A protein has these predicted regions:
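Sec-dependent N-terminal signal peptides
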Residues: 4-13
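Conserved beta-propeller blade repeats
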Residues: 95, 113, 120-121, 160-162, ...
Length: 436
């Protein structure tokens, strides 16, 4: 009788309990048809669908290769952490997160990547975050983790700014490659085009609005925190001949109650602060860029744009001597194709698009492009759908059955495109277009 009473009380408690969650932050679910496997080693655990077992083993090889050097500059190595692989998402990315702790890889290679293999880049970048997390999970933060679990460890992430974490990780992937992201001309092109970063229009230091370079802006174009962090971190390493974030992490994890631990640690150990590092970094970059040989500037805008216009026009396709078709994106409406008169700047909307994945191409009055399409059921199934539009009709249509397409290239009577398979094979496809 007593056992029955306890059972009834337990069931009642379950009935009134709030909804339980297994984790706080998730990237979403994978398709249910995938069968999962695991590879266990003393340091990492690979969790992957059977369809990408080769990718998982290759990634494990990269992890083992970088392990001796991935913690360079920090006093503690990477934490023991599982790697979870998602093969059916074309929006390539990586993530390191607590609650629960794991590294997640979207294994489809980046569309705008470079010569460094995608899995190697992910390992060199995301595994460096595992080093940062382990160095932040010390002292008081570690004590909190015994009481609060991984919620306590998450507090340590407040002791190191996000731009510093990402900049240090970009330094890691750059150092572990022959031509990494930090060495790409496009990676610093935004700052170089601006000229006087952190100064007003008269060339004076802009003391009022320096925060926008760290927080972003809806009015002005500001490069992201990856680019900012890499420039500051690489300058700090060159100036002080050590990784300054090791001491920042060490101090912050032991004194989280001080709140502004980054500022205090930089002043205590290096006699500087974030504002000074920012100014010194871009002063040094400006001197370097000014010392380079001058080259002729042959580019000219198609049409004069209004001042303060925060709009992007991409991939112009000529329609006539005075008209081009461009993809327009801004903060007001979804991306769309517009006809642009190069003489007057007048625009005529043609059709709206989704999130475009690869550049459009045109032949015979028909425009082809690809755009990301997310599954309505599974967040981790994101395809690259082949689409087209006849200029006479101005209606976007879907090329049925082509969901893994990239870089469509039309020709007389035919269409070719690159097709990526989640199993990690890339093919070149061709199709007759007379029926469409």
């Amino acid at each position: 009788m007593r056992r029955l009473l306890y059972t009834a009380l337990f069931l009642c408690a379950l009935g009134v309990a709030p909804k339980a969650r297994a984790q706080y932050y998730t990237w979403g679910s994978d398709p249910t048809g995938l069968k999962w496997s695991t590879i266990r080693t003393p340091d990492v655990r690979m969790i992957y669908p059977d369809t990408v077992s080769g990718v998982a083993r290759r990634t494990l090889f990269y992890i083992r290769t970088v392990q001796p050097d991935i913690s360079y500059g920090f006093r503690h190595g990477p934490m023991r952490i599982p790697f979870v692989m998602h093969p059916e998402n074309f929006q390539s990315n990586g993530l390191v997160m607590y609650l629960p702790k794991r590294v997640e890889f979207l294994t489809s290679p980046a569309i705008d990547g470079y010569s460094m293999p995608w899995y190697k880049q992910l390992v060199a970048h995301e595994y460096r975050h595992a080093v940062q997390y382990n160095n932040l999970n010390r002292g008081v933060i570690r004590a909190l983790s015994y009481i609060l679990g991984q919620q306590g460890s998450t507090i340590g992430l407040l002791c190191m700014p996000i731009w510093a974490m990402e900049g240090d990780a970009v330094m890691s992937e750059t150092a572990m490659s022959s031509f990494g992201r930090g060495l790409q001309p496009s990676f610093s092109m935004g700052y170089r085009a601006m000229g006087r970063v952190g100064r007003d229009y008269k060339g004076r230091r802009d003391r009022r609005n320096i925060d926008k370079w760290f927080c972003g802006s809806y009015r002005d174009y500001i490069p992201d925190h990856y680019e900012l962090g890499y420039q500051i971190c690489s300058y700090a390493y060159a100036r002080y001949d050590e990784n300054v974030w090791d001491r920042v992490a060490w101090f912050g994890s032991r004194n989280p109650y001080m709140l502004a631990t980054t500022r205090i640690a930089l002043e205590k150990y290096y006699g500087t602060n974030v504002r000074e590092l920012f100014r010194e970094t871009f002063d040094a970059l400006e001197r370097h860029w000014d010392s380079l040989p001058r080259t002729g500037y042959s580019a000219a805008p198609l049409v004069a744009m209004p001042e303060g216009n925060y709009t992007t026009y991409q991939w112009p396709l000529p329609l006539s001597d005075t008209t081009v078709l461009v993809l327009k994106t801004d903060y007001d409406r979804p991306s769309r194709f517009v006809r642009l008169d190069t003489r007057t700047g007048a625009e005529e909307p043609v059709c709206y698009t989704g999130l475009v994945s690869t550049r459009p191409a045109m032949y015979g009055g028909r425009v082809w492009w690809t755009e990301y399409r997310r599954s309505k059921l599974f967040e981790q199934r994101v395809n690259s759908q082949l689409c087209y539009m006849d200029l006479e009709r101005g209606t976007a249509r879907t090329f049925v059955g082509r969901r893994n397409a990239l870089y469509p290239t039309p020709a007389p009577g035919e269409l070719a495109w690159v097709e990526y398979n989640p199993v990690s094979y890339t093919h070149l496809r061709a199709h007759e277009t007379s029926a469409h």
